[in-house]
């Protein structure tokens, strides 16, 4: 599309142009013209409009322009130059000439005109009729009179067509003169443009196109549209020109759609011969990208090439060129793709199939030429390269790859074709035509190395663009292609460097070609002798998948490296481990069976398996080490351990090792729920153990102790030495180990050391040894700790194991004691016990101890109760005390959780019925079920057993307890017929019976679930401080009148025989600032500090009473952090009177 300058035609009868041409042309081009089109009121901004000044030619102005390719072929403006003379010369000589010229130019449609009056320094000879001498001033005014006459003679309407250029006053026209000239010229240009565009737009609008329209209608429409587009182009309005071309292509697309792929319909819409097939000479990239073949549609018609093929490419070439002009490179690229896709339409199917290689070469040339034009444009404009350039390079690379395949430079299995879509193959092709028309491309595909070099160049340039735009997906794919090209060029180091820039494992993880890419990458690493990295990569891509690289390849790589490799077991093996198993050791140890499978390796290749079970502890863990008992068969893994230590273990690690390989696979299971519980040894074993995990707190010897029952197996004394060492972790709440002791029935001694306790001098197997270890001075709530036991067997083996113990929560109940005096007998006092249970308990006894002068404690009283307590209750007793004896009293209470009593009763009942089974198996399940007991389970003196107890009847549980079906059925029937409710009386009887020693000796297990709550908070009324407040109000109080009120606080020490010296404390008070009857102003809330010996405190407030009559003052809320301070309420009323209406304001009403 060639650009033409708009024309201004000038008429110069007095030869003025040579002297002023330079000045006028220096003002051109016109800048920033604002044109509002009259047709659609569209606003256009012409940034720069160059004009061509041509001398007057009458035929040129009046010629027929209907066939011109642009609206600018004829002059836009006709201009007349006249010299400036006096009025007489103008009237007799210049005006007739100007009038004759004006009559000619005014007949030309769509052309503007203007008259330029030029005042020269050497003026023409004046007329002889002017006989007087003119001064400069009179000449100036005469000249002014001349331009006014010209305007009066020729101007029409309010438009000024006449301007003056003054070369007399300053040798050149001033700025005002030039502005007037340019303004007139701009108006004339825009007026002509608007008129012409309006006329052409109306002509196009009058063309009605229908499905039944004939060829001539469509052709006229396209010709007029092209004139409009070309005219916009000449005015540097590229976007407007592009809009017209796109409108033309939209209409052509509708025609193509109506043709419906039938050649016989092409002639109907585009005329005879328009269905002709293209010729090979038409495939020139400059025709499509640069539009160099046909400038206008008239040229296309004149050459007889108006076919569907030529016309479509003609329009698309215009659109590509205009998009390049406006720097819309992405749109230019998409238009090129649209044009190349059009070549593959069904209209040209036969031609395409016969010329696949030529079309591919043409496509390659078009992509490379477009890339070249874009890079040249951005280089001139100093702008960043657009992202579409990378896509252009990749499309060019695709065409290049196809031609390389057709020339047998690569075969169908080449990795360069992995990502490429399928394309037809050419059995016989002639390179002579390709050599003649695409010589440079022919050289590129003359050899494999030249092709790969060009492939690498295109890929690397695209890669740099993707990298600049941080387009991760395209960058990764192109980096892989670049590395692949370098690999095929045997440049392995650079290929490795290209692939290291991306995470190839992640990039290929979801790629359908993952296996091919992975093999290529491993081969590259092997060529570089990076065997360790190749092995790691091969293992990473094989995780959990049906062997991309089978075991043979991985094993082969593992033999090339000397480093041992430990991989995650879950990535290659699947092991089904039960969440919880209760296991019973046999004579030779413990056997465990798991299901195992692998998608990568054969299980026969596993050489060894090691399972490490750890006793739950953060320090000094105790281990059970299981090893492979035999080979893995039928997907079943059998492991064995002969180191039998009772306790609950969680799985820590599993390690698999392959045969003849440095590879091993490990699974870490810290904090795992994959657990086993070794419940034995029981009473028949040669071990000792701690059965209970819940440890009670008891108040003994003026302190709180944890009672730990240690169970001894029947053969323990024969199988071990006479010492047992106990140690525990720090921060367990234990203190003063030297105060630890054993119960009297333990029949052994105890020695305390710095960090451990030693049970020694075991005279006989005691069954149970109750160990009391002192805790801190306050009850410990919910504290867990690990206690470790160790002893040496007769065989010399040292057995070490631990037990996680949970100190039973002492917060199951809140209790305190309070003492009041008997006024009649000062030495007799009443002691109250206030109990606030947090869950159902059995209150066993209430104890009081007194410290003697020797530092020991004697019992004052020990009152048994053995009653259930479900809600707050108070107990009291009367005691005889000396004067100050109360300060040395220690109170405590013993209780049992109701849930624990039910648990003990159920355990005993089961043991009595099934004394031949190990009750330890079922105890954890019973305990868990009984913990569900709450207040909702208690009705009318009975405890409703939780439904969880019935679940012990499950098949899995029964199978784990009993070996034969008869015992399973008997136990199932026993559970089924358990009473659903247990009375409080039966529970009380059970507790009393259970505490008898004879009964305890026959049990194979031991309970120590009594909770001792103490020392209890104790409050002595004799030493309590009392705070009383008093409202002091004036005698007369009036309605709605401010009244000063005093709030007085009084302090007294009730029945105190001696007050602690120097004691001070704080109280806090507050009362509402507003009630329905009183409004207060003043400190309604405040803190008061009582100093030593201070007895009163006062606060002043102002009150306004809102109601007359008897009014009650608000209650003052007083509280203190000191529990020994009592608050006495003092309710106060006052009478509020009404003031008389005729009385003046007084402080008090009469």
Curated annotation (Swiss-Prot):
Gene Ontology cellular-component terms listed: cis-Golgi network; cytosol; TRAPPII protein complex
From which domain of life does this come? Eukaryota
Gene Ontology BP annotations: early endosome to Golgi transport; intra-Golgi vesicle-mediated transport; intracellular protein transport
Q: Name one Pfam family in it.
A: TRAPPC10_1st
Q: Which family does it belong to?
A: Belongs to the TMEM1 family.
PANTHER family reported in the protein's UniProt record:
EPILEPSY HOLOPROSENCEPHALY CANDIDATE 1/TMEM1, TRAFFICKING PROTEIN PARTICLE COMPLEX SUBUNIT 10
Name of the featured protein: Uncharacterized protein CC285.14
Naturally occurring in which organism (per UniProt)? Schizosaccharomyces pombe (strain 972 / ATCC 24843)
């Amino acid at each position: 599309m060639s650009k033409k300058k708009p024309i201004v035609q000038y008429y110069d009868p007095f030869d003025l142009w040579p002297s002023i041409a330079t000045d006028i042309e220096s003002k051109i081009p016109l800048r920033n013209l604002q044109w509002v089109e009259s047709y659609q009121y569209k606003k256009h901004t012409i940034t720069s409009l160059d004009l061509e000044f041509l001398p007057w030619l009458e035929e040129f102005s009046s010629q027929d322009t209907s066939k011109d390719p642009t609206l600018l072929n004829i002059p836009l403006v006709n201009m007349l130059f006249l010299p400036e003379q006096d009025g007489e010369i103008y009237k007799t000589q210049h005006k007739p000439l100007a009038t004759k010229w004006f009559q000619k130019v005014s007949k030309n449609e769509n052309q503007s005109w203007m008259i330029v009056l030029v005042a020269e320094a050497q003026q023409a000879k004046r007329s002889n009729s002017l006989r007087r001498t003119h001064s400069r001033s009179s000449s100036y005014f005469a000249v002014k009179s001349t331009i006014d006459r010209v305007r009066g003679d020729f101007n029409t309407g309010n438009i000024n067509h006449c301007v003056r250029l003054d070369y007399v006053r300053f040798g050149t026209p001033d700025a005002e003169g030039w502005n007037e000239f340019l303004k007139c010229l701009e108006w004339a240009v825009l007026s002509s443009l608007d008129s012409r565009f309006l006329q052409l737009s109306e002509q196009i609008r009058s063309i009605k196109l229908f499905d039944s329209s004939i060829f001539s209608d469509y052709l006229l429409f396209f010709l007029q549209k092209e004139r409009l587009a070309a005219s916009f182009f000449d005015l540097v309005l590229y976007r407007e020109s592009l809009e017209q071309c796109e409108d033309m292509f939209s209409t052509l697309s509708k025609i193509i759609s109506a043709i419906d792929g039938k050649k016989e319909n092409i002639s109907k819409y585009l005329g005879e011969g328009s269905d002709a097939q293209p010729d090979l000479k038409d495939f020139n990239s400059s025709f499509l990208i640069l539009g160099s073949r046909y400038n206008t549609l008239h040229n296309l018609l004149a050459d007889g090439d108006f076919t569907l093929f030529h016309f479509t490419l003609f329009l698309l070439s215009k659109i590509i060129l205009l998009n390049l002009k406006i720097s819309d490179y992405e749109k230019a690229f998409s238009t090129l793709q649209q044009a190349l896709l059009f070549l593959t339409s069904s209209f040209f199917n036969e031609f395409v199939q016969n010329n696949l290689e030529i079309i591919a070469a043409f496509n390659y040339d078009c992509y490379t030429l477009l890339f070249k034009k874009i890079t040249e444009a951005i280089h001139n404009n100093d702008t960043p390269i657009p992202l579409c350039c990378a896509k252009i390079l990749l499309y060019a690379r695709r065409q290049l790859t196809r031609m390389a395949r057709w020339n047998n430079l690569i075969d169908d299995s080449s990795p360069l074709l992995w990502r490429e879509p399928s394309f037809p193959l050419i059995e016989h092709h002639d390179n002579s035509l390709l050599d003649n028309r695409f010589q440079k491309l022919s050289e590129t595909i003359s050899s494999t190395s030249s092709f790969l070099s060009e492939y690498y160049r295109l890929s690397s340039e695209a890669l740099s663009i993707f990298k600049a735009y941080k387009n991760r997906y395209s960058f990764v794919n192109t980096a892989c292609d670049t590395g692949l090209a370098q690999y095929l060029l045997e440049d392995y180091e650079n290929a490795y460097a290209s692939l290291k820039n991306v995470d190839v494992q992640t990039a290929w993880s979801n790629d359908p070609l993952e296996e091919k890419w992975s093999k290529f990458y491993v081969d590259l690493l092997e060529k570089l002798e990076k065997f360790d990295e190749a092995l790691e990569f091969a293992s990473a891509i094989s995780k959990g998948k049906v062997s991309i690289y089978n075991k043979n390849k991985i094993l082969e790589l593992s033999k090339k490296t000397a480093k041992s490799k430990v991989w995650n077991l879950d990535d290659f093996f699947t092991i089904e481990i039960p969440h919880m198993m209760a296991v019973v050791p046999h004579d030779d140890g413990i056997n465990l069976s798991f299901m195992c499978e692998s998608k990568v390796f054969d299980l026969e290749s596993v050489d060894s398996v090691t399972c490490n079970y750890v006793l739950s502890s953060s320090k000094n863990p105790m281990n059970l080490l299981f090893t492979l008992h035999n080979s893995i068969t039928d997907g079943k893994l059998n492991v064995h351990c002969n180191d039998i230590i009772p306790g609950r273990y969680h799985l820590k690690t599993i390690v698999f090792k392959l045969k003849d390989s440095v590879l091993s696979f490990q699974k870490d299971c810290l904090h795992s729920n994959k657990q086993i519980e070794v419940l034995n040894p029981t009473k028949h074993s040669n071990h000792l153990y701690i059965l209970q995990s819940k440890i009670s707190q008891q108040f003994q010897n003026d302190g709180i102790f944890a009672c730990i029952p240690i169970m001894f197996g029947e053969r323990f004394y024969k199988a071990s030495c006479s010492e047992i060492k106990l140690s525990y972790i720090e921060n367990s709440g234990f203190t003063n180990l030297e105060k630890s002791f054993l119960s009297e029935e333990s029949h052994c001694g105890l020695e305390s050391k710095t960090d451990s306790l030693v049970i020694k001098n075991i005279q006989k197997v005691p069954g149970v040894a109750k160990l009391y270890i002192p805790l801190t001075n306050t009850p410990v709530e919910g504290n867990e700790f690990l206690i470790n036991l160790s002893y040496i067997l007769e065989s010399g083996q040292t057995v070490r194991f631990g037990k996680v113990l949970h100190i039973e929560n002492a917060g199951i109940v809140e209790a305190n004691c309070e003492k009041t005096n008997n006024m009649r007998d000062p030495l007799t006092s009443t002691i109250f016990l206030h109990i606030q249970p947090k869950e159902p308990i059995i209150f066993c006894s209430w104890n009081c101890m007194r410290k003697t002068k020797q530092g020991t404690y004697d019992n004052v009283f020990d009152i048994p109760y053995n009653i259930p307590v479900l809600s707050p209750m108070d107990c009291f007793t009367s005691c005889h005390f000396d004067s100050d004896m109360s300060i040395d009293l220690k109170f405590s209470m013993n209780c049992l959780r109701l849930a624990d009593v039910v648990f003990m009763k159920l355990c005993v009942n089961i043991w009595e019925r099934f004394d031949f089974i190990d009750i330890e198996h079922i105890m954890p399940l019973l305990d868990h079920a009984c913990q569900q007991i709450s207040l909702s389970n208690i009705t009318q003196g009975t405890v409703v057993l939780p439904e969880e107890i019935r679940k012990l009847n499950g098949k899995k549980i029964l199978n784990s307890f009993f070996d034969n079906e008869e015992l399973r059925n008997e136990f199932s029937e026993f559970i089924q017929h358990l009473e659903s409710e247990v009375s409080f009386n039966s529970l009380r009887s059970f507790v009393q019976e259970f505490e008898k020693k004879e009964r305890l000796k026959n049990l194979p297990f031991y309970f120590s679930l009594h909770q001792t709550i103490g020392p209890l908070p104790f409050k002595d009324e004799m030493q309590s401080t009392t705070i009383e407040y008093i409202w002091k109000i004036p005698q007369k109080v009036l309605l709605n009148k401010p009244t000063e009120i005093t709030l007085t606080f009084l302090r007294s020490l009730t029945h105190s025989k001696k007050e602690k010296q120097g004691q001070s404390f704080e109280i806090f008070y507050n009362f509402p600032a507003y009630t329905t009857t009183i409004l207060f102003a003043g400190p309604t809330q405040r803190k008061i500090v009582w100093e030593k010996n201070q007895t009163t405190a006062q606060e002043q407030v102002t009150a306004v009473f809102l109601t007359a009559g008897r009014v009650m003052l608000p209650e003052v809320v007083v509280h203190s952090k000191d529990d020994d301070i009592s608050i006495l309420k003092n309710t106060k009323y006052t009478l509020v009177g009404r003031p008389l209406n005729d009385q003046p304001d007084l402080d008090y009403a009469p």
